[in-house]
């Protein structure tokens, strides 16, 4: 594979070719005395960028907002949305600057600086991102990719001593993040709320032609738009099944944080569950628990209805739109059962397996069992070592009775225990980005030390593989981790 220097990348800038009502062209506001804290060679390969370029002064200048991407077209996009279930009106990229779109071996990727200064859409914000939240986003996007879950990616993390005020004084940072597109549900809501059918159609055509060309083959009047909604609904359903299956909580599933491509987008107050609780809320700011773990699939459907309502300006037949969205629950349930069945070591999901899963989750809830390690221990039990699994439960007799039910189910499945256990280890991760692991990386980064970021990325790229010397990263959280909380402050 031929890798390029920064000024030789192939750029497309398709979003910038839309009418200028979709964005504002502007220059980034550079960080003072920026330093490259970490760069991601794996992400660089996607756009054909030579990893050596990541450590050049030219790249630092681009990643810190000092100069535009060669051949790029820097802009901030406008969108609207519902936040915590309430219409928030116009929003937009309040601190993100889209540098351009690069075509490389891994497809087309938009490059965006998050934390690069004020835009016309900043509202009450300062246009900056703090080091704390930037480290979390940088790590989380790569952790999700390692888990096989659709996500934006992270290319680089640049830091500065520039002060930023949140609850306390912090320092500024910029994440260079990558996505095939940053178009959101809220991008459609924006034009729908203005009853601007012309621009709504332009946006729909852009998304269809760029990302869902198969929708053009749909039959019937407005078939392409209905097919678009169906594709987005299907991808969203599968994304929710992915999240639920690894105990991931997004924390702020507003419609402006929902990707039109079904990607995990905008890592803020997210969290991977430690002690399992059905109604676990990872965002300290979510006082009503709207975005609790067990509500995420239904919130996603609520958000899809907001998207469907926006498309009503293009599809007058509301029943047709509702008919598409009526498919979501079946899509999600099938995807969720497939993932959870694999985690339980089942080749095919049967109707009785619903009770088996529900009973396990209830036992885990009652014991506050660790989500990741409890599921991981199931493969050990299949290999004949049941005690590690049972030790996660307060009521071990009930856990033993449950295990006996699963073992009986396995006996009807026909696979050898070793094959079954190996398959379970491939879908039950050993390493996830727990809050305390991210916090340790943040504390080191605040001292200019990126070694913990580097260590975590190495582990999280292979989350299903046992890695020697990494026992501490696969252990229960230390007691001090109970005091950690995350919020919308970033």
From Swiss-Prot:
GO terms for molecular function: AMPylase activity; ATP binding; magnesium ion binding. It holds the Pfam family SelO. The keyword Repeat does not apply. Mg(2+) binds at residues 257, 266. Its cofactor is Mg(2+); Mn(2+). It catalyses: L-seryl-[protein] + ATP = 3-O-(5'-adenylyl)-L-seryl-[protein] + diphosphate; L-threonyl-[protein] + ATP = 3-O-(5'-adenylyl)-L-threonyl-[protein] + diphosphate; L-tyrosyl-[protein] + ATP = O-(5'-adenylyl)-L-tyrosyl-[protein] + diphosphate; L-histidyl-[protein] + UTP = N(tele)-(5'-uridylyl)-L-histidyl-[protein] + diphosphate. The active site is at 256 (proton acceptor). Its EC number is 2.7.7.-, 2.7.7.108. The keyword Manganese applies. Keywords: ATP-binding, Magnesium, Manganese, Metal-binding, Nucleotide-binding, Nucleotidyltransferase, Transferase. It comes from the Bacteria. ATP binds at residues 92, 94-95, 114, 126-127, 177, 184, 266. Belongs to the SELO family. Nucleotidyltransferase involved in the post-translational modification of proteins. It can catalyze the addition of adenosine monophosphate (AMP) or uridine monophosphate (UMP) to a protein, resulting in modifications known as AMPylation and UMPylation. NCBIfam families: PRK00029.1 (NF000658). This is Protein nucleotidyltransferase YdiU. The gene is ydiU.
